[in-house]
Amino acid sequence: MKKYLLLALLPFLYACSNSSNQGINYDEAFAKDTQGLDILTGQFSHNIDRIWGVNELLVASRKDYVKYTDSFYTRSHVSFDEGNIVIETQQDLNRLHNAIVHTLLMGADAKGIDLFASGDVPISSRPFLLGQVVDHQGQQIANQVIASNFATYLIQNKLQTRRLQNGHTVQFVSVPMIANHVEVRARKYLPLIRKAAQRYGIDESLILGIMQTESSFNPYAISYANAIGLMQVVPHTAGRDVFAMKGKGGQPSTRYLYDPANNIDAGVSYLWILQNQYLDGITNPTSKRFAMISAYNSGAGAVLRVFDNDKDTAIYKINQMYPEQVYRILTTVHPSSQARNYLLKVDKAQKKFRVRR
């Protein structure tokens, strides 16, 4: 468990320093960051182990928002992939009520949220979950009055109890999101997506397909590989390439990438780099699209090496194939199972968004 937590915390620790040390070599910055890792890991792990038990580790990820409050005795978990919200506490029901209200009314701005502090998430006048969850009367949860009434209803009618392995009792409620919650989230970002699509000449549906696969449109998304935000941009790789293309030095900070406009622009900029620089020699548009999708996940070099170790020879071989052959090879021969599945998922998601446009 400690090893897993270490991996989960690495991105956050690295993020703490990269916004102020962008001129530092990545390896040097990484080494400096890890010096304080034992302290941060120990503190967070100790809180979770002591309060929830060693088998109850729950941390934020690409498609999961997780926030601890009340000195870590209360936590909220929004699964954007499964479309379900679970809010639970080991304290009194007033704390559960408070957590329900704050979760339902949290905003979309991830920049100011400290996932390792145990304070409440601020209530927003523009709740991010608006339109994705309805109360017991079927109305949208747009303000504190509606959220408070719904929280009271949930506690009075839907309260559940479970016992942890450490003997602690947990009281919790589970709130399903509406059936088309993914599409509702996607619509929130359409203006930004369209702007970036037009600016860089990238298909709108491709951006949507990648964003759904990467984060399920979760603005708080972060991965163990330090991929940040909606399009899961890795600061020291894709982020650095994007900054170089824009004539900037260094790499984007975590705070920069948690801004949806910046994140989408960076992600689509990287698609432009893949399309017009790293994979420019591929002539068939469909074959190039398949290669771009796979490269967004595993890197252009890894994609080309599937066909040949020499870049020019790899591109030549791709150009001799039908797109269906390129797709089959990338989804069956690529050495990374994640990359193989990634192309399948993005292609499926992109087709779905094409139909709905």
Swiss-Prot record:
Pfam family, one: SLT
Lipid modification (S-diacylglycerol cysteine), residues: 16
GO biological process, one term: peptidoglycan metabolic process
GO cellular component: cell outer membrane
Gene Ontology molecular-function annotations: hydrolase activity, acting on glycosyl bonds; peptidoglycan lytic transglycosylase activity
Keyword set, alphabetical order: Cell outer membrane, Cell wall biogenesis/degradation, Lipoprotein, Lyase, Membrane, Palmitate, Signal
Record keyword Lipoprotein present: yes
Residues forming coiled coils: none
PROSITE patterns: PROKAR_LIPOPROTEIN, TRANSGLYCOSYLASE
Lipidation (N-palmitoyl cysteine): 16
Family: Belongs to the transglycosylase Slt family.
Function noted in UniProt: Murein-degrading enzyme. May play a role in recycling of muropeptides during cell elongation and/or cell division.
Protein name, per record: Membrane-bound lytic murein transglycosylase C
Organism in which the protein naturally occurs: Haemophilus influenzae (strain PittGG)
